[in-house]
Amino acid sequence: MASPDEDGRPSLPNPWDAILEAVKHQLPSLDSDSSASDCEDEELFIFQRNQTVLIPDLSEELADDPAGAWVTSSGSPPGLAAVPVESAMEPWGEWNAWPRPKESAPLEGRAPSKSSSLLRMSAETPPRQDDDAGGTLNTSASQSPRQGPQGEATRSPQEAGLQTEPLGAASQAQEGSDAASRKALRRERRKMIEKDILHKVTWDGRNPACPDASRGKEKACDAVEVPSEGPPGCLPVLSLQELEEWDLDQVLLSLTGREEDRGDGAPGAAWWAAGRLQGQDHTEPSTQDRLMERLSLLCARQSRETCRAQPGYGTARERVGSSSSSGHLGRRPLGLSCPPARVLSVRRLRPLEIRPGPALG
């Protein structure tokens, strides 16, 4: 089959023989039924059979191949079929595609180990060349500007970042200026509130154009200043210190008097001072007198309604009530426009006593 080499190993013309030689002891026989532990001659004879018997006969299946890649000879015994050159060199297809070096050309006279090592080396070299070529292509592509679909050069991410930095700095500067303007507006508002609003309710911040400001401070009775007829822009100045000294009861009574005021008495601006000033001549009745008058009118109205429901009350009593009401209204001030009311006396008239006369005979 082959002549022995210098090292004592048979030289194989085909690499498939080397592969079969390596895996020969791992392929079992088709008719091996007994275990390998038996040491009989029959078992030894099974493993000493011909090499072609160890591989199943696939000639019939390969003959049905339409491509006709596998060719079998009619006179050859059933065994290994003839293998075409392209399929035999299939494991080394990548190596065949590259230019074959001069040293690896004659492989027929070398041992399988040497040929396999050379094949491994030659198979490993092309990817390195691919990597080198890819690296050169990548470096050249990175150096040259990228072009878009229309031939325009697109900018790299670094250039885009350099261009976006000035935009970001401008936006930050604009935000900083906006924040500074907001702070300035807030400060101006605080100053305006402190000067224009808070100083108006204190005596130190009153308007000097108001002529009665100093006079009101001296002549104020208990709490507030009486606004006089001054310039229209002069506003009443209040003091927080004097607001705490106000008499709430007196303020409530003065409010009730203000509701009844119609303009004939004291002026509307000084409605609260009319009832509080003592020792001065004034024609307006006090608040207590007004309240008592209203109570008397209410009682008279209710009594009149009850008296009308009772029989026996004639026109004389109405006359008495009208006379008493007219006399009472004479004491009322003319400034109050209240409807006239009739006041009836609560005293009841005694019923007439009828004495029986002497009996006639």
UniProtKB/Swiss-Prot annotation:
The gene is DNAAF8. Residues 136-157 have a biased composition (Polar residues). One of its GO terms (molecular function) is dynein complex binding. This is Dynein axonemal assembly factor 8. Its main location: other. In cyliated cells, dynein axonemal particle-specific protein required for deployment of ODA to the axoneme. Interacts with outer dynein arm (ODA) subunits. It is found in: Dynein axonemal particle; Cytoplasm. Keywords: Cytoplasm, Phosphoprotein. The keyword Cytoplasm applies. InterPro entries: DNAAF8. GO terms for cellular component: cytoplasm; dynein axonemal particle. GO terms for biological process: outer dynein arm assembly. The keyword Cytoplasm applies. Residues 65-191, 309-334 are annotated as: Disordered. The modification Phosphoserine is found at residues 142, 144. Residues 321-334 have a biased composition (Low complexity).
